[in-house]
A protein has these predicted regions:
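Loop-to-transmembrane alpha-helix initiation sites
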Residues: 41, 116, 143-146, 161-170, ...
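Transmembrane helix-bundle core of multi-pass membrane transporters
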Residues: 124-241, 297-298
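Membrane-helix/interface signature in polytopic inner-membrane proteins
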Residues: 181-197, 236-275
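Inter-helical junctions in multi-pass inner-membrane proteins, predominant
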Residues: 25-37, 132-136, 214-228, 238-243, ...
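Cytosolic-side transmembrane-helix boundaries in multi-pass membrane proteins
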Residues: 1-20, 24, 139, 171-204, ...
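Alpha-helical transmembrane segments within multi-pass membrane transporters and channels
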Residues: 84-125, 331, 336
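Transmembrane alpha-helical segments in multi-pass inner-membrane proteins
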Residues: 102, 275-286, 292-358
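Single transmembrane alpha-helix segments in multi-pass membrane proteins
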Residues: 20-83, 107-117, 132, 259, ...
Length: 374
């Protein structure tokens, strides 16, 4: 069987199997409350994984993102809670810090020809130390008392029911338009066009799934705003990788960096740009993860780099670069989130969680090596 077909079948089946197992062990797993919680967690892992996807496409890796999530979230929390900065300004400062730090790392990698593994491993330790210094090894809330601000609302705000349904309808309409344009483009280039019935059936499936998901979320509090952050990030990364020269350069560099350089691609600038975008993903994830915790603590971001890498590789992104899709990353992140959420719901011991995460990461790398040969 073709390896692409095998992977495409394996991922949905793995997700169904994981969800089925946890639902059998604990029916509340598929309840509105837990699914909403799962989606918030998925938004955090998925956003970080999308940033990691851009790095892995070029054949690089970033081991510093977990510590960076804690550091950037901590910077914003300190500015809000200890220095009375308005939340939007504090979040902007955190984003600026992330852009500076990740552009510096990217610059070091390309200017000094140091492997990204080494630079980002150092970043992991440096950022962790800076994080603990920034929060002074204490707990820093993201807001004062019971007051709400933009920071705290990142994972606690839910769309009103009517807005969620309207948004689902809008997304369904956009999908229909994109499908129509894709068919028109294939017809214009005299390529094979799938039957109308298949296209309409596929669109109806997505539309029903979208409305069903919103109805399910409305059974608790509504669609979490963090899901919109993930959706916007995914849409941006999809457009970047599929419809811009920068995205094509990422694939080319990962496929063969020497050939990319000889063909005139500005390899150094593209790599620095990829790391800067990784910094944006780290900042967004840091804000959401810290808000989800309610405060910046020394454990925020722990091991998230491994979850992001595993999500990418499970979804078909090659560690050697040059191969991967946004949809695969999203599916890989969903599998990782379902696994972690289910273990938490079943009150699995922390040591078993570590073993499971390590096993999943090892399996993901094995899949990359074995299936990548096909």
């Amino acid at each position: 069987m073709n390896t692409r077909v095998l992977r495409n079948l394996a991922l949905p089946l793995a997700l169904v199997a994981i969800c089925g197992f946890f639902a059998f062990k604990e029916p509340a797993f598929l309840g509105p409350r837990n699914l909403t919680q799962l989606v918030v967690e998925f938004s955090m892992i998925g956003t970080l994984a999308l940033g990691m996807f851009l790095i892995l496409l070029t054949g690089q890796i970033d081991l510093s993102v977990g510590s960076g999530v804690g550091l950037i979230g901590g910077i914003a929390a300190v500015l809000v809670f200890q220095h009375d900065w308005p939340a939007p300004l504090a979040l902007g400062a955190g984003l600026a810090a992330a852009l500076v730090l990740w552009s510096l790392m990217g610059g070091l990698i390309v200017s000094q020809r140091i492997p990204s593994f080494i630079i980002t491993l150092g970043g992991l330790l440096v950022f962790k130390g800076l994080f603990w210094l920034v929060i002074d090894n204490s707990t820093i809330p993201v807001s004062r008392g019971d007051e709400e601000n933009l920071y705290s609302l990142l994972t606690t705000y839910y769309l009103p029911s009517s807005v969620g349904l309207a948004l689902a309808g809008l997304v369904a309409a956009v999908l229909a338009l994109l499908s129509f344009r894709a068919r028109a483009a294939r017809r214009a280039h005299r390529l094979g066009v799938p039957p109308v019935a298949r296209a309409v059936g596929g669109w109806l499936g997505w539309a029903v799934a979208l409305v069903g998901a919103v109805v399910l979320f409305n059974g608790f509090r509504g669609v979490p705003v963090s899901l919109l952050v993930l959706a916007a990030t995914a849409a941006g990364v999809f457009f970047l990788t599929r419809h811009t020269p920068f995205g094509r350069y990422l694939y080319a560099i990962g496929g063969n960096q020497e050939a990319a350089l000889l063909s005139g691609i500005p390899v150094n600038r593209v790599l620095i740009g990829a790391f800067m975008l990784m910094g944006v993903a780290v900042a967004l994830t840091g804000f959401m993860t810290t808000a989800f915790s309610g405060a910046s603590t020394t454990t925020v971001g722990d091991l998230m780099e491994l979850d992001a890498i595993a999500a990418c590789v499970i979804g078909g992104t090659a560690l050697r670069g040059g191969r991967g899709t946004v949809s695969g990353v999203i599916l890989g992140a969903l599998i990782m989130t379902a696994l972690l959420n289910g273990m938490t719901l079943l009150a699995v011991a922390p040591e078993i969680k570590f073993i499971a995460r390590g096993a999943v990461l090892a399996l993901a790398v094995w899949m990359d090596v074995r299936l990548g040969r096909g």
